[in-house]
Amino acid sequence: MRRVAIEFSYDGTDFFGYQIQNNVRTVQGELEKALEKVFKIHIDTYAAGRTDTGVHANGQVVSFDCPNDRLMENDIKNAINANLPGDIYIKKVWFTHPTFNPRYEAKRRIYHYYIDTSKSKNLFTRRYVWWFPYELDIEKMRIAAKYLIGEHDFISFSKKGEENTKTIRTINNLRIIEIKNGLILIRVEGISFLRGMVRSIVANLVRVGTGIWEPEKVKEVLESKDRSKSAGLAPAHGLFLYKVLF
């Protein structure tokens, strides 16, 4: 039996998040059903991160123990893909060491969040971007973003329920990139994140971009350690787990 790692993407629109739950469709549930079809036994999987309902992934990573030692990487990839629904796709398969667990061995996780500020709604991208048809001051957003880089207590930028967990996190890089035609990318890099943290960061930066807040307000929210001071959460469908680095 060999430990296998897979990198895969999924459209999170029609899933109730990544983590397996009873009576609802989840990414982990569909993946483990496909593995059971291929290998004829139940196989537990270990993921680099658990995305919320509606959140997508370009580079999620999962490990599991493969009961068939004769299959090569490409055989495993093709067999799993043949049994997955159309909104999940295995991109890469590789053999790794026997205890590899992407959740604990990830050195960095990169999230992308897309905002469409164009005046007309694009029906063909609406599942993957936050349509926000208002002008944003990108330079002010970049100033505000600098307050969040480094190690901080991010409880103000988390969902309820994180109070009893360690809320110190480190953001290694936070970039705001103007792509084209009103499309904006917010790229956030860190080792790990609190639940809702990236979406909260985006919502607070957008509040600055609209001119309602000055950039320094984000620093105040951070230092307050009070979730009620935050601008809330940006919509889930604009967020992608882009890449996990080891």
Swiss-Prot record:
Keywords: Isomerase, tRNA processing. It comes from the Bacteria. Substrate binds at Y111. It catalyses: uridine(38/39/40) in tRNA = pseudouridine(38/39/40) in tRNA. Its EC number is 5.4.99.12. This is tRNA pseudouridine synthase A. GO terms for molecular function: RNA binding; tRNA pseudouridine(38-40) synthase activity. One of its GO terms (biological process) is tRNA pseudouridine synthesis. The keyword Magnesium does not apply. The keyword Ribonucleoprotein does not apply. SUPFAM superfamilies: Pseudouridine synthase. Homodimer. It is an enzyme of class 5 (isomerase). Belongs to the tRNA pseudouridine synthase TruA family. Formation of pseudouridine at positions 38, 39 and 40 in the anticodon stem and loop of transfer RNAs. The active site is at D52 (nucleophile).
